[in-house]
């Protein structure tokens, strides 16, 4: 059986000598010797294509909604908003490979030509790795925000996040260079896949290990480590807050800490579980197929199809995790989706805004705290610039220090020294 590499690289005919990126499901669909009627294969291909198109539509709508909320309803984007924007963009572009995958399943051949094959596979791979790398970067950012909030404040800014996001896209493009070089539609075949030089088995195995390490196991290790340290930090902080002095003096703070611990724990479980659930079968099937070729029996079609669809389903679920679990995105979605009904309710007597939950209040409090930290950071930077201006000049004159807040600080005029007065009188 040929190796499984990218969700979109799914040839529908089997070439045991050189085909390298074939999905078992789609390869079997193109192989009439599997013992299944051609009519049954055609129906299966059409049904699978319809499922892919549904996943594509849902993913495009969800990620487009996230992108619109970030760009339209975020006046001053935070670090998390920048990463969510890039994640949604990568997931949305990742969805664009599904129509080509659906067409190849329905037609049992690639109708778009060799150049389009190479372009689709390259773009699909870039956005696949960008999506995974964005999840990893967001996990590192959450670790810095929770475990090292003070030391990381100067680095956790929107401009730095944009530069990191640009580096993620460049790194993803570099990682998929082998796809650009070796993908295409070989002569005598009608499918889009990767064709390795001899020895093809060694190249194929090396590429499977390469993509699995960079595309799953490496990011998973970083994500698990970050969230493990976050949980340890939150629990240690909660134990300090649960002290008797805190229970009597800072009861509201204790409650907020407990709610924050529960919220972070739920987010950790959701992120890690979804990531592992959607991507581990994909890469495990790759590795198993290298060690022991997978059977081409119709009984395994459902398993192969599920493994192909799960990575795309992860991109559909990301807007739910990173959008709907955030109060800020909830409000943005409500403004977009419930605008007509909200106008009707606003005309009804006694109607008011919905009551906020404890998590929403905690998130608003956290956003206010982050905004206050950003203002304090800007004030400290202003103080630093003013202190540099107030340093002694080349003539050795010392300027008086300023007092007041950062926004009110201005340099006071210097009093002339005795030498200056004498020099001035000599010129009169």
From Swiss-Prot:
A GO cellular component annotation in the UniProt record: non-motile cilium
Principal location class: membrane
Listed Acidic residues bias regions: 357-370
Assembly behavior: Homodimer and heterodimer with SSTR2. Heterodimerization with SSTR2 inactivates SSTR3 receptor function.
Segments on the Extracellular face: 1-45, 104-118, 183-206, 289-302
Region of interest: Disordered: 343-428
Disulfide-bond pairs as recorded: 117-192
Modified residues (Phosphothreonine): 357
Functional summary from the UniProt entry: Receptor for somatostatin-14 and -28. This receptor is coupled via pertussis toxin sensitive G proteins to inhibition of adenylyl cyclase.
Compositionally skewed regions (Polar residues) per UniProt: 385-412
Protein name as annotated: Somatostatin receptor type 3
Tissue specificity note: Densely expressed in cerebellum and at moderate levels in the amygdala, cortex, striatum, spleen, liver and pituitary.
Organism of derivation: Rattus norvegicus (Rat)
Keyword Disulfide bond part of the UniProt annotation: yes
UniProt KW Membrane keyword: yes
